[in-house]
């Protein structure tokens, strides 16, 4: 069964899918080992691993390459950010083909102008509703398998208001999207209203310190959200821990005791035993042939 088909099964279960954000194969593997049903490739995290802010500076090729590394490191479905689709509806068509080809289960496409910026920043700009819907229709037409999910993200709440966000979400669902993603609702009343007023499954972006009020995952599920992504969960933790470790070493001149040893057990978590078995098997074949 494809990961896209597995993702469809998760959606059909009516249990909210919680997908922490992965920025690379390492964090994807950790999410998998922690037992989550899906992972989410964050565009912000991908940008930051390349040394850039979330300002739309990363190309489609770079995003697909990172998604490929994560897909190859996990055993569960990957939802991926695909920003604006990297151009107009023709670019979106190719974007869908590329993400689907490497085994991603679902992508979200947004209605910001290109280049975009993080959905929880100010001064965003939107394309027209007509241009947005053209992209969604192109995305739905481009996929080879109907299991591959198109998530329609709208950033219109911050630019033209909540009502336009609801209208764009419903229009996207009516034109081929499978899931709606109203980015950055600004009050708890708006958070609760989205799954009530949108005519299809809804995704909630859980961003600490962003425009949306903090919410417990159980409350999001009670409100009716189908998916909750946590893009900054590991990214924020990595930055905080790295800053602290670097400060400790600079101050004390030695590694703190909390640092895990390498290689040993750490490599084992990333498949060392499997690769050892393969090498032994290949060499055993040579020995048998020589005899």
Pin down the residues of each PLM region.
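Alpha/beta enzyme core
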Residues: 2-233, 237, 244-247, 282-291
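Flexible C-terminal active-site loop/helix
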Residues: 249-291
